[in-house]
Amino acid sequence: CIGSRAVTDRRKSTTDPIKEGAVAYQENDIMAGIAYLHNLAYTLSKPLVLCLGLGTNSGGHGGTSALSMLLSYVAAKRMRAVVVAAGNEANARRHYLGNLAPLQEYEDVEISVGDNIGGFTAELLTNSPEVVSVAVQSPTGESQPLIPARQGSSEEYRFLLEGTTVSISYSLGEFTRERELIFLRFTNPSKGIWRLRVYPENYVTSRYHIWLPVTEFVQGDIFFLRSNPETTITGPASAYAPISVGGFNASDDSLYLDSGRGYNIDNQVKPDFLAPAVEVFGPDLTFTKGHSFHR
């Protein structure tokens, strides 16, 4: 539009140990860039459109992360718009939807881990006020003792036969709208089928979600044997206020199968609309698929 300008803010890469060559940034650095652009637009009395082609499977999946809340704050202001890509995780097999039946003692969640995986994380979120506990079983059948859910509790267990270390941390309601968060970290996992045994501690609906890292962050094959393609929209596109954009194939008017799907964890309708995402010409006249840096 007349009088508009493009402002670029380059973010430094994250220092977290993820796949070599992955495009990744620390959340606090992204927030610093957003604050800079927001304040610059205010100083110049200009409208501002923020476009984020980044996504993650970490966090609350409902707009409760610090970045999501900042984007919602900016999006609510006059002369501001925030647009976020929905990610490409629908067919990545890195989301699991659990649904425990009444009186069911536990449910086994199977994760297939390939060769030469240095480590990975998994995040379990319940539907409030559900509370669950987890135990881990290795491919050789060695089991970690059940760790009951307690606010702030954290345990680490070493599987001797595999040489794998698993740490489990519980958080009840912290930054997740009173949801329980169980964070699991696997270090040097051996190849095979790892099992998370999920035990209900109180039964309400007994629905829960587990997410593995986005494809771009994982080196090797890690996926759920019984995955679920729904609720795969990445954060911060899962936040309520920002405009989240999914992808479709413009050549045949079909849904791009990898495009992140809703709803978010709070059953809010996401994404807001779809845009062409297959064989799209970029500025350097090359073809791309997807609609974020995580392809």
Annotate each language-model stretch with its function.
Residues C1-R295:
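Loop-rich non-cytosolic ectodomains and luminal regions
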